[in-house]
Amino acid sequence: MKGFLKPNFSLGALFLTLSPIATACIAEKPVNNRFNFNSEQLARLRKARVNHWRDGDTLEVSFANNHQKPIRIYAIDTPEKAVLSIQRKSEIELKEANKATEFAKSLIPIGSEVWIWPLNSYSYDREVAAVFFKTNPLQLHFESFAVEMVANGHALPIAGNDFDFVFSDLDPFNPLKIVGIELANGLNNAFNNRKNIFSYLENSFQSITMVYQQRGVDQSWTRYLAPSNDFSSTKLGLGLTIYELKLNNG
């Protein structure tokens, strides 16, 4: 996914000058991480079993034919475990990366069943896909791994360059069209309550610039914030938020 905002990018310096009060008291909606798919959507899912968690947004699974594959989870980004640049090495980022990995392992332990929704694209050796799971094997609804990670402050929701098409020209079976609003609800909950990656520095936005040091921040995460939030993409002139796109496109 594209659209990364490097730690020393000029917009980042501008955002840091904004008042901490700007992040307070933004309305949020409860997160509903329950999804019921129709027959066409169910046909997109591939059942798999979790073999290993590389980090909070990458896992390795095996399918019924015993074929094994690494999966890069679509639409989220967790802090980086690998040290890509000594100059940008951050103990805080490593701490949050490890917390994200451990949360993923506790949410979906090794050996658990998951349902993979492939996007027919790759990131290095990893197939990009949405991941769904069931807390109870008897339940009919599915839960989104991405929504759970974001709502608990372990990941940022991202959309790259496709965001403007989420509620218009994007493939109607793209999982982001289904889970996008709940990703936004989860983000606003974590942001307002300063959970994990949002718990550093003077406010939640500044905290992100502190945590995501290795690769910078994909600025599309601001498009999931409530329009009234002073750090939302609408207020910063980076495009409409997902709430506004849904309102405009149904």
From Swiss-Prot:
It is a lipid-anchor. A lipid is attached at residue 25 (N-palmitoyl cysteine). Residues 1-24 form the signal peptide. Residues 44-200 form the TNase-like domain. A lipid is attached at residue 25 (S-diacylglycerol cysteine). Coiled coil: none annotated. Keywords: Cell membrane, Endonuclease, Hydrolase, Lipoprotein, Membrane, Nuclease, Palmitate, Signal. It is found in: Cell membrane. InterPro entries: SNase_OB-fold_sf (IPR035437), Staphylococal_nuclease_OB-fold (IPR016071), Thermonucl_AS (IPR002071). CDD domains: SNc (cd00175). One of its GO terms (cellular component) is plasma membrane. SMART domains: SNc (SM00318). One of its GO terms (molecular function) is endonuclease activity. This is Uncharacterized lipoprotein MG186. It comes from Mycoplasma genitalium (strain ATCC 33530 / DSM 19775 / NCTC 10195 / G37). The lineage of its organism: Bacteria, Bacillati, Mycoplasmatota, Mycoplasmoidales, Mycoplasmoidaceae.
